[in-house]
Amino acid sequence: MILFVKLLLAHMLSDFLLQPNSWVEAKEKNKLKAWQLYAHTFIHFIITMLIVWDLSFILWATIIAAIHFVTDGFKVFFQFEKSRRVWFLADQAMHISVIVIVAIWSQNIVISFYPKLNEYYLFLVTFVYALTQPVSAMIRFIISRWTSVTENNDSLENA
């Protein structure tokens, strides 16, 4: 369970906090030619290794990063403006599925160095973070089709 939480935290940090919107736009525009796609994949690998903190997990982290690259590559090639929501949700579902599978398959080779208190704290931090940044990004993305209709530009900028 704790490995799943670590991998989920690594994913959320890498996909939401450490990936600027400019990178997402560059990936959509330049597809496989975007250096941002490769940097994003490398960040996933590094953050996963830092959070798991076990060198024997390097093969699994490589697998996660490689599948993340392929999934993001498919997404940028096949999504269109009208299908962005569907591809975003499918992309996230694929990433979470990979995390679940890796957490299950790798349990026999990964040893956690954290005591129980730290496991609880890590779970709590991951849960709280999930409720802030990633969930708000998902909600904003899902309701984006209606925000342009309800926007009122008669206010102060950034107010």
Describe every region a protein language model picked out.
Residues 1-5, 46-61, 103-123:
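Helix-coil boundary and interhelical linker segments in multi-pass alpha-helical membrane proteins
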Residues 2-21, 71-73, 122-136:
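Hydrophobic, membrane-facing alpha-helical anchors
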Residues 7, 11, 36-40, 60, ...:
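Alpha-helical transmembrane segments of multi-pass membrane proteins, especially transporters
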Residues 13, 17, 47-51, 67-78, ...:
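Alpha-helical membrane-inserting segments
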Residues 16-30, 71, 75-79, 135-159:
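Cytosolic, membrane-interface loops and tails of multi-pass inner-membrane proteins
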Residues 31-55, 62, 88-103:
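Multi-pass membrane catalytic core of lipid/isoprenoid biosynthesis enzymes
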Residues 70-93:
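Membrane-interface helix-loop-helix junctions at boundaries between adjacent transmembrane segments
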Residues 90-107, 119-140:
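Alpha-helical transmembrane segments of multi-pass integral membrane proteins
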